[in-house]
């Protein structure tokens, strides 16, 4: 068919020149080369660049280290388009696990038509039952392999990021890894964490400038999410207003003492960021901390996140304000089930 898949973590592929391999494949009639685990191959971006420049072969490459790929991607500017595969949405989880296949909805659809959409969805599934499972086990496709070892695999994934990816791209001394793990545990057990950088530095024995650096690395690695206040604008040096685990599955993997309020907010931030972030925008500017309410989305909508007893007292008389409420199947007016924000992508 003219297509070939190779994985560069294979020892045989490690012994070859990727460019020469691609050249020979093209000479034998190859048209498309799929290259997996590309970050495991030394100077992979140079080889991809040379293939692009010298051959007519099309190349699709992928890797599981977003940090290592993004570091070398600058070599491929104007030659490649990089797509980031985010964690599964609640809707994708339902489809992957063969529970039910639903369409996704844009944010405006959910805000305006959530009652009719939820009424239709609840004819097919019990969303609250599956949502609780999703918060613990639904973010990554390897839930299909084995539920019992699911959280262990997440811990292994985080260890790989801390012990391999970060030192590789940032020249972090190995002695700092223990401090990084301490920092991550501190965040996991206190999210949504309202950061005091000085206190974090003291608790982890990391210097204040390094705390900022490490938080940025962890966010780029998709381990945490940070949120700034809109009032502070785009001040690069402004500390984050809140810190969350990137998704709730990471929280459950790191600690058994999960605050449900934290989990709700982390889910909301995760799904909004994943659904609305566009790589055509210079900054991730779709969601901020809000002065009234919890979150400001698209400079227009105010959201307060909570349990079913949450009321509008904190966002009373605020225009375009909504409650994202857990533990309800179907909402009413500006009161929207939290699980529905898992249908954005």
Where are each of the predicted segments found?
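A cross-kingdom feature that marks ATP-driven nucleic-acid transaction machinery
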Residues: 1, 8, 216, 222-345
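Conserved P-loop NTPase "ATPase switch" module shared by AAA+ and STAND
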Residues: 26-44
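Structural recognition of the conserved hydrophobic beta-strand(s) that form the central parallel beta-sheet
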Residues: 34, 58-64, 84, 324
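Interdomain hinge/linker elements that couple catalytic modules in large macromolecular machines
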Residues: 98-252
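Sensor-1/coupling segment of RecA-like P-loop NTPase cores
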Residues: 53-73, 218
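Short regulatory helix/loop adjacent to the ATP-binding pocket of P-loop NTPases
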Residues: 67-82, 94-99
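Short glycine-rich substrate-engagement loop in P-loop NTPases that contacts/grips substrate
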Residues: 2-32
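Conserved Walker B catalytic segment
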Residues: 39-60
